[in-house]
């Protein structure tokens, strides 16, 4: 089970999701949100080429922090060659800086089918991570608490 294997590799780490600026940019955002809500796990997502102009500089600072990060590079069969090259080089750079780097390739096929498969994979990934952490993926107590506190402020709708 590929989603379960990836979940085991990501368990206990801060997860960075990197994708091209095409269709998988939305998938990376979806995966991030599912990891937050279901697995109760901090995650971050960014897309190339923009991340290679800014975020990559954040990897320069040496230290133990990078060893607690797992990068998942998401590839799409329709990625332009220059985008794929950027993703490969960015993953290699993160690995040299101490992060664990994993790759995920969307299956070939029509775009809608690829996106549906990618979303499904991320949903399963988030559920497996929740199970590994012993977390119930359904309740969202921090959001509920935030809404209660927000509603307690005069004139602020929840």
Identify the residue ranges that each predicted region occupies.
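A SIS-like phosphosugar-recognition module
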Residues: 1-158
């Amino acid at each position: 089970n590929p989603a379960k294997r990836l979940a085991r590799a990501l368990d206990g780490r801060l997860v960075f999701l990197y994708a091209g600026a095409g269709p998988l940019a939305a998938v990376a955002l979806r995966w991030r949100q599912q990891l937050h809500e279901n697995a109760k796990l901090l995650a971050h997502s960014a897309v190339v080429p923009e991340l290679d102009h800014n975020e990559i500089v954040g990897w320069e600072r040496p230290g133990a922090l990078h060893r607690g990060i797992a990068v998942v590079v998401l590839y799409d069969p329709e990625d332009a060659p220059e985008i794929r090259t950027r993703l490969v080089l960015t993953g290699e750079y993160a690995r040299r800086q101490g992060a664990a780097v994993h790759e995920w390739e969307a299956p070939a096929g029509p775009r809608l089918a690829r996106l549906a498969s990618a979303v499904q994979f991320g949903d399963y990934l988030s559920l497996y991570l929740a199970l590994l952490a012993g977390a119930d993926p359904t309740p969202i107590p921090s959001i509920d608490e935030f809404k209660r506190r927000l509603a307690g402020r005069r004139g602020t709708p929840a």
